[in-house]
């Protein structure tokens, strides 16, 4: 899937004045492209408040990061669970009205989650880096900053806000971007979960021999519909490669019951990312235990 970056608006000069005119391809083709295009604006606004240089100055005072992959592999629950804190989504709107991130984090940790994923996108998911920072103060579990990362600035902001890991989405990043952003994360001691949505993206990521955490997203990011067959079909072809190269495969989205979890474990999935399934429940701990009681 190809996601374009926002084309710059051309300018027209009339005598001594210049006017920006809409680019003829300045309309996003799908939700993911719309989100990525807005990120450019969001990052510029962030930099007006806190510069990259100011973020870097804060690094020395931070504690060491926690090992995201190790936490998944050592989980008593199989597969290891990346439990997500998410208030809303573009396709479903507000998912959890009574949204108390710290209490949600407590519930996840008590239930046996390996790690916690925190949505930091504000415009489309009603998340924030402030929420990430609050959750960091509420739990000792490794934290994943779940955002649409296109800039090194976001990685520094995630680290300063308490994240131990970041998400990189293969569909929105060039090869050069992936290499560069992975290097930045490595230098900050952060883990990288790289996300793929189809076999073509997976082949591309495997060819780099760079990532040891690969998330197979069962959600079509053009339509935001989910289908567990995405994970099943990719694991049927590539589980041996994952094992050979010590890659930890994570199945993301669309996981709803114990039978699906058993199936994922049987095909070699080591971790699952579950968010909406828990966010819709009043009693998260009860829902968590019910989902994993027979695994």
From Swiss-Prot:
Single GO biological process annotation from the record: L-tryptophan biosynthetic process
GO molecular function, one term: phosphoribosylanthranilate isomerase activity
Entry EC no(s): 4.1.1.48
EC category name: lyase
Catalytic activity: 1-(2-carboxyphenylamino)-1-deoxy-D-ribulose 5-phosphate + H(+) = (1S,2R)-1-C-(indol-3-yl)glycerol 3-phosphate + CO2 + H2O
Pathway where it operates: Amino-acid biosynthesis; L-tryptophan biosynthesis; L-tryptophan from chorismate: step 4/5
UniProt-listed InterPro entries: Aldolase_TIM, Indole-3-glycerol_P_synth, Indole-3-glycerol_P_synth_dom, Indole-3-GlycerolPSynthase_CS, RibuloseP-bd_barrel
Pfam families in UniProt: IGPS
Keywords: Amino-acid biosynthesis, Aromatic amino acid biosynthesis, Decarboxylase, Lyase, Tryptophan biosynthesis
Keyword Mitochondrion: no
Lyase in keyword set: yes
Database matches in HAMAP family: IGPS_B
Homology family: Belongs to the TrpC family.
Protein name per UniProt: Indole-3-glycerol phosphate synthase
